[in-house]
A protein has these predicted regions:
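Switch II (G3) loop of P-loop NTPases
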Residues: 2-4
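His/Asp/Glu-rich metal-coordinating catalytic cores
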Residues: 10-19
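Substrate-engagement module of ASCE P-loop NTPases
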Residues: 21-24
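Internal gly/pro-rich beta-alpha loop/helix module
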Residues: 30-126
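Conserved beta-strand elements of the Class I
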Residues: 33, 154-156
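Flexible inter-domain linker/hinge segments
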Residues: 93-154, 161-170
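Single conserved hydrophobic/aromatic residue that forms the stacking wall/gate
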Residues: 176-184
Length: 184
């Protein structure tokens, strides 16, 4: 995972490193997955694919062709828009994976599974899955985490950047998951 925005100067050394890595070990042993936001504009009631097209173009300009695109959106992306992403990003339609925003990050793997992300990774590397994937434990955890009837406890976090939502994200997640584990 590189993180950030494609084209930002901070990420360029890392992008160059993974480009060289792919060349060194061989393209058949690497899979570039590009996570992109596909915004929905309420004012025009449409999904915009242009930002995704531009970010893939930017990746290509530095020598990286994504093999798969995961499109994050507020709502389901119509097939014609997915085909457009496929066409202009030079990625097979089956590797244009959508993930609609979920309530909690614990739902994301279930969403990816439902979209066939695992199958596409297996197929890309020519790997036969050994057994059927059992998502029941993951679904159980998700159910616990999304349960609205859990008790609440007030905990104060004292720090310099408490007004910034993500400043203490890891601590927030730790407290959240420890409570879910306690309810399990």
């Amino acid at each position: 995972e590189i993180g950030g925005t494609v084209g930002d100067i901070e990420s360029l050394p890392f992008l160059e490193a993974i480009r060289q890595f792919a060349n060194d070990i061989g393209k058949e042993k690497t899979l570039f997955i590009h996570l992109t936001l596909v915004p929905f504009l309420k004012s025009s009631d449409e999904i915009k694919t242009k930002p995704t097209q531009h970010s893939v173009k930017e990746l290509r300009s530095i020598g990286i062709q994504p093999d798969m695109v995961i499109c994050r959106s507020q709502q389901s992306i119509p097939l014609d828009q997915r085909k457009k992403i496929s066409l202009f990003c030079n990625i097979p339609i089956k590797r244009v994976i959508e993930t609609v925003d979920v309530k909690t990050i614990y739902e994301a793997p279930i969403s990816f599974f439902n979209e066939g992300l695992d199958k596409q990774v297996f197929e890309y590397f020519n790997i036969k899955p050994r057994k059927k994937i059992n998502l029941k434990p993951w679904k159980d955890v998700t159910k616990i985490v999304t349960n609205k009837n859990i008790r609440t406890v007030n905990i104060a976090i004292v720090g310099k950047y408490v007004d910034l939502k993500d400043a203490y994200k890891s601590l927030d997640c730790l407290l959240y998951t420890s409570d879910a584990a306690d309810d399990a």
